[in-house]
UniProtKB/Swiss-Prot annotation:
EC number: 2.7.1.39
Listed name of the protein: Homoserine kinase
Catalytic class of the enzyme: transferase
Species, as recorded: Prochlorococcus marinus (strain MIT 9301)
GO molecular function: ATP binding; homoserine kinase activity
Pathway(s) served: Amino-acid biosynthesis; L-threonine biosynthesis; L-threonine from L-aspartate: step 4/5
Coarse class of the protein's main subcellular location: cytoplasm
Length: 315
């Protein structure tokens, strides 16, 4: 396999994600129509050169080197394809805010995998890229929907293979995501969780997940209300999110069917009917404002096509 010519450019667009949705801890996630865009360019130099230039929506520019997740993912592609690494530049337009529970790390991993693979004319299958993504991230609930799109349930089977189920999301159910101007790292959110949980809590979550998935499939409001409930992680994580429980209560009082921490937080996901969306959004922002936290709460649609790439120039 030959090294791509200098100047070849690939554009990769990767959606944000909301994970867990309450009871689906570390196994359920949905892609949302908020995106990070990556432009990969083959540049002069050896495989130890990786230039990462990031531009956020607030106009700030940041740089990252070989320690960045994008580069680590690209390295995995080179290793799996038995390819000598080559110099790359990645320019990133950041719309997915980091450390907010919207899968920003997953976008970096997925983009690095797809970009490095595409610039070499895709020697690795999508299945292999999924395997690598889960291995790098350590859990599947963000990277799988980020790559594939839609609502995805991912579990390791008795044969230790990852099994992915594309679940249905009824058109009548809308998502409002309240995104605060505060950060919470996934590692910090995991530290507060117990190593062991009561069997009764595990059983409760299994039942709730079944109700939620059926509610999302059929649009049954009662099933969503009863199923968007968690005993495994949220009871321990709410205390890390300033004003979080007040925001949840405000959303429910404004007509939300259910409310959950998005991923590890601090963003909060509310599911509702379209006609209640504006009230839910305004109530969540106001509740956080009363706790001294600035936020925004946009409507975000479930994105069904996953990550996409295109060749800008070169062969």
């Amino acid at each position: 396999m030959s090294i791509p010519e200098v100047g070849k450019k690939i554009r990769v667009t990767v959606p944000s994600t909301t994970a867990n949705l309450g009871p689906g801890f570390d196994c359920l996630g949905a892609a949302l129509d908020l995106y990070n865009e990556f432009i990969f360019t083959r540049i002069e130099g050896g495989g130890d050169r990786f230039d990462l230039i990031m531009e956020s929506t607030d106009g700030n520019h940041l740089r990252g080197g070989p320690e960045n997740l994008v580069f680590r993912a690209a390295q995995k592609v080179w290793e799996s394809a038995n390819m000598d690494p080559f110099a790359l530049e990645a320019r990133v337009k950041l719309a997915v805010p980091p450390a907010r529970g919207l899968g920003s790390s997953a976008t970096a991993i997925v983009a690095g995998l797809i970009g490095a693979n595409a610039i070499m004319n895709s020697p690795l299958s999508k299945e292999k890229l999924l395997e690598l993504a889960i291995d790098i991230e350590g859990h599947p609930d963000n990277v799988v929907p980020s790559l594939l799109g839609g609502l995805c349930l991912t579990a390791r089977s008795s044969s230790q293979r990852w099994r992915i189920i594309r679940c249905e999301w009824h058109y009548s159910i809308k998502a409002v995501v309240a995104i605060p101007a505060i950060r919470l790292s996934t590692s910090e959110a995991r530290k507060v969780m117990p190593r062991n949980v009561p069997i009764s809590d595990a059983v409760t979550n299994m039942g709730a997940l079944t109700l939620l998935l059926n509610g999302l499939k059929t649009g049954n409001e009662e099933l969503i209300k009863e199923g968007m409930f968690d005993k495994l992680h949220e009871p321990y994580r709410w205390k890390l999110i300033k004003g979080g429980l007040e925001v949840k209560d405000a959303a429910l009082n404004a007509g939300a069917l259910g409310c959950a921490i998005s991923g590890a937080g601090p963003s909060i996901l509310a599911l509702c009917k379209k006609e209640n969306g504006k009230n839910v959004s305004q109530a969540m922002v106001k509740a956080w404002e009363m706790s001294g936290v600035a936020s925004r709460a946009p409507f975000l649609n479930v994105q069904t096509t996953g990550s996409q790439f295109s060749t800008i120039s070169g062969k």
